[in-house]
């Protein structure tokens, strides 16, 4: 089941945050990027406190999550997927995105086999991604202005 956060708010910007039951938000994010070229953001962004409210994270669970994070294990860190829609986006483009999300959910068991999860970063990495390519693109982000 796909859940849109704050779905009761009808007047909103073209930004939708959602999650799918029993599928890690960062796995969906990387699959939509790698398979369809759809750029999304996974995690809780800068809305951790609001996220606790939206996801019904109580104090006890929050404490358990932060204790795990403090020990270097981010695997319990909650999050969602954020989709931003551009005003010039067509209905067909939106339907393609919806179709890609549906395909990802339908094929998750097969497609996730191509990825490994790192609990220290809470990210998924393609198991066949060459190290030299990874080194090159991470270098781009380290360039100083």
Show which residues each predicted segment covers.
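Short, conserved charged micro-motifs
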Residues: 23-29, 88-96
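Short secondary-structure transition/capping segments
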Residues: 51-56
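A common structural junction motif
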Residues: 35-41, 101-109
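Surface-exposed acidic, glycine/proline-enriched linker/cap segments
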Residues: 58-76, 80
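Structural preference for beta-strand elements that scaffold enzyme active sites
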Residues: 15, 39, 80-82
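Conserved small-domain helix->loop->beta segment predominantly found in fold-type I
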Residues: 1-30, 41-45, 50, 69-75, ...
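Short, low-order "capping/linker" segments at domain edges
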Residues: 57-64, 122-142
